[in-house]
Amino acid sequence: MPDLPEPYHPLTDDRFRLLVDAVVDYAIYMLDAQGRVASWNSGARRFKGYREEEVLGRHFSCFYTPEDRQAGLPQRALDSAAQCGRFEGEGWRLRKDGTRFWCHVVIDPIRDSAGGLIGFAKVTRDMTEQRAAEQTLKQSEQQFRLLVQSVTDYAIYMLSLIHI
């Protein structure tokens, strides 16, 4: 007689929290409807540098550069997520120690059963190393283009001397 399958146990709040906290390559946290940090995972702690008790209740704009805060980017991101169903972008953010890191950000609205906005889910990934590699590749490509152009210009110059 075959074994009966074990009963399915959906994720409880505790198990879901364990799942989110196990993800260390992404900062996954919730903001309330005003943009204050309402939850914090180990990935956020790892690359932003804040412990949960240091950041809960703080407005998420503290992760933005002064220039982006001055330009109103944090509020525009929340407004876009609330109105369009999602905000996605890349930019510089700040760690607790003040150092900058380049990141990819996704913000999704969280709504209650009546459709009212109750907060936002925010997922951030540190892309600093990838961006540095892209910048190095771009520089290398530019240098190669300049070299090819210089060789081409020199060849044209030499050919023009031969035909004179």
Place the predicted regions along the sequence by residue.
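PAS-associated C-terminal cap
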Residues: 1-15, 113-116, 125-142
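PAS/LOV and related PAS-like sensory modules
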Residues: 11-33, 137-160
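Terminal output helix/cap of sensory domains in signal transduction proteins
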Residues: 15, 56, 67-99
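PAS-family sensory domains
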Residues: 30-32, 38-42, 46, 64, ...
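PAS-family sensory/regulatory domains
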Residues: 42, 54-68
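Output-coupling edge of small sensory domains
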Residues: 92, 108-113
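Sensory-domain boundary capping and coupling elements
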Residues: 105-107, 124
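Conserved small/polar residues in nucleotide/adenosyl-binding loops
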Residues: 162-164
